[in-house]
Amino acid sequence: MKIVALTLVAFVALAGASCPYAAPAPAYPAPAAPSGYPAPPCPTNYLFSCQPNLAPAPCAQEAQAPAYGSAGAYTEQVPHYVGSPNREQVQQFHQRIGMAALMEELRGLGQGIQGQQY
């Protein structure tokens, strides 16, 4: 343990002796160049367009008290993007799945036969 401590002290002494003296850093950082952009004004809703001017956008109107809890804001039915498949579509789907499984099985058999030596 004494050897480790002695080695550490010697290393610190050599490192300190080999480094040139540097002036201490200032207590506070030097101020940077002033920014060219001023602080933005208070937030405002703007509509952006191709025109050179900006017009404030109107804020949303206060909603009336909902009659159905949180669902009161919705006025239309929930859209259905995919309908229920009919019997023919279900059969086609099952045929495709069966054909894909059969192809995978045949590929596996083909690779097994190629790996065998006669």
UniProtKB/Swiss-Prot annotation:
Subcellular location, in the record's words? Answer: Secreted
UniProt family annotation: Belongs to the vitelline membrane family.
* Membrane spanning residue stretches: none
List the GO terms this entry assigns under cellular component, sorted alphabetically.
egg chorion; extracellular space; vitelline envelope
State the UniProt keywords alphabetically.
Answer: Secreted, Signal
* Top-level taxonomic group: Eukaryota
Q: Which GO terms describe its molecular function?
A: structural constituent of vitelline membrane
> Which positions fall inside the VM domain?
36-75
- Function field: Major early eggshell protein.
What is this protein called in UniProt? Answer: Vitelline membrane protein Vm32E
Q: A GO BP term, please?
A: vitelline membrane formation involved in chorion-containing eggshell formation
Q: Which gene encodes it?
A: Vm32E
From which organism does this entry originate?
Drosophila simulans
The positions making up the signal sequence are: 1-17
Specify whether Protein biosynthesis is a keyword of the entry: no
